[in-house]
Amino acid sequence: LFRSLLVDEAHNLVERGREMYSARLVKEDFLAVKKIVKAMERHEKRPEVHYILRKFEKSLEAANRVLLAWKRECDEFEVISDAGMLEFALLRVAGDYELVAKEYPVLPERDTILSLYFDVRRFLAVLEKFDESDRIYLDYDEERKFRIKIQCMDPSGCLKEVMERVQSTIFFSATLLPIRYYKEQLGGEKEDA
């Protein structure tokens, strides 16, 4: 079966690729979810579910502590070499959330909790593929909220991995110049036309 990948507006793919293979977490999101979980704990009567909620709260606190330590050392912007202990804390957050979700098919403030869960999952997925083309940095957003971001600097490896799953890839764009730059950034090889 002949399979082709058609990419329109290919000049945008480099920047989109950087964003697709990047992820960020905001420290204050962990505190917001922790507050919700504490309120759930206060109202929970089932001891086994109370235990699960408490465990989830502790994993949120552990992730928050790692972020807080970095926040204290970061004035405006700092590049770090790895996510260190945060990765383990995030694995716990994700696993503990899944236990809570089994007990609460309808979560209070569901959107806030799910948003953090999906951000954590995305961060872990991007972190799993972390290589020399990525950077991890700490900074503050426009509202002065502290965040950690894995930034894909060169998406060519990830894009090439996708393109290797098909027989051919055709890029459409009126502005793929300079051609060598785009060829390199889009995962092209020397022999590619």
Residue ranges and their predicted role:
Residues 2-193:
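Conserved coupling segment at the C-terminus of the helicase ATP-binding
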